[in-house]
A protein has these predicted regions:
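Structured C-terminal subdomain patch of bacterial secreted/periplasmic proteins
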Residues: 173-182, 273-340
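Extracytoplasmic ligand-binding site segments that recognize negatively charged/polar headgroups
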Residues: 98, 137-145, 155-185, 216-239, ...
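Short helix-initiation/N-cap motifs at beta->coil->alpha
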Residues: 53-57, 111-121, 141, 254-263
């Protein structure tokens, strides 16, 4: 079922707007979770321009739906593609992996500016009216340039709200409500309100259909690192996804999105399953080998019995691939034989 929500949306986009080539209720904020944040965009009526938006404390105004969009990070690129605005992408950068198959045709002819952050000059040469980034650091002096510089030149910028670093802007805990709220907000910014509403409805339905097959099991979300593993902690997308499938995160007590966790702590936690993040630069297979040759983890039952779940890196950051990742992990869990 992974990807069905997006596929259903794409099949229904032909008649809407601009066309382009292509363990509680996990969707509701619970105690201690951040309620969906309000913004100028989400408070404005659909199709209302000029449109004021704010992300990570930076305000911008879109006089009309952007026609020349640059995206940085897969999460931003895939959001624009999924909302049917791929024909307005004039450049992308910092791809974390291949786009989902159903979005590939829409992405095929979009120019790639850089493997990581592009130079600000390269972005400005494209004369964008919107630069949309998945990380706050993408739009910084060390990234593709400061947001203020773009603003001074009349270019609107937007950063995924879940990626805000300032405590006053960062969600206390990521929820599916917040992820779906970003879809709605970006849809409004692009003038693709109908497409956004369809995607949100499809993803809510897909999420509601998930059976939490990991109930009663503990898990380590292993992202990278061999000397010291870098793992999913208690307030980001990994925690949100594990909650949705019923898994108990062994690093849930760390109030951060990601954290370093010593191998001895991993061994002491003795997780029932290990979620392996599959990235081109650090594959799931490489992580399996690292776990099997590390004397601290080699004797863990989860390693010896290969109780592994695999999730692609682009699905580990807040965005439209989180719900399909839940569906996929639930299916993988259903196939594992783990004593409870």
């Amino acid at each position: 079922m992974a990807g069905l929500a997006v596929a259903a949306l794409l099949s229904g986009c032909a008649g809407s707007g601009a066309t382009g080539p292509g363990a509680a209720d996990p969707g509701v904020a619970g105690p201690g979770e951040a309620a969906p944040s309000s913004s100028a965009a989400s408070a404005s009526p659909a199709g209302a321009f000029p449109l004021a938006v704010s992300s990570c404390g930076v305000d911008a105004t879109l006089e009309e739906p952007p026609e020349r969009i640059v995206t940085i990070k897969s999460s931003a690129t895939e959001m624009v593609l999924a909302l049917g605005a791929g024909d307005r992408l004039v450049g992308t950068a910092f791809a974390d992996g291949d786009v989902p198959a159903e979005l590939a045709p829409a992405a095929a002819d979009v120019p790639v500016l850089a493997e990581k952050n592009p130079a600000q000059e390269a972005v400005l040469e494209l004369e964008p009216d919107l630069v949309y980034a998945g990380w706050e650091s993408n739009l910084s002096a060390d990234g593709a340039g400061e947001r203020q510089t773009y603003q001074d030149l009349g270019v609107a910028t937007y950063v995924s709200p879940s990626a805000c670093k300032g405590a006053e802007h960062r969600p206390e805990r990521l929820t599916f409500d917040l992820v779906l709220e970003e879809i709605t907000e970006v849809g409004r910014m692009l003038g693709e309100d109908e497409a956004a509403a369809e995607l949100v409805a499809a993803q809510r339905a897909e999420l509601d259909a998930v059976v939490p097959s990991g109930a009663g099991l503990t898990a380590l979300w292993y992202s990278s690192g061999e000397d010291v593993p870098y793992v999913g902690a208690g307030i980001g997308a990994p925690q949100m996804i594990m909650d949705a499938v019923g898994l108990e995160n062994v690093a849930a007590g760390v109030q951060d999105t990601w954290t370093s966790l010593g191998w001895e702590a991993v061994a002491e936690a003795n997780p029932d399953v290990v979620v392996l993040v599959d990235a081109a630069w650090n594959t799931a297979e490489h992580k399996k080998e690292a776990l099997e040759r590390n004397p601290v983890t080699a004797t863990l039952p989860a390693v010896q019995e290969e109780r592994y779940l695999v999730v692609p890196f682009p699905a580990t950051e807040a965005g439209m691939r989180n719900v399909p990742a839940v569906t996929d992990l639930a299916a993988q869990l259903a196939e594992l034989e783990v004593a409870r």
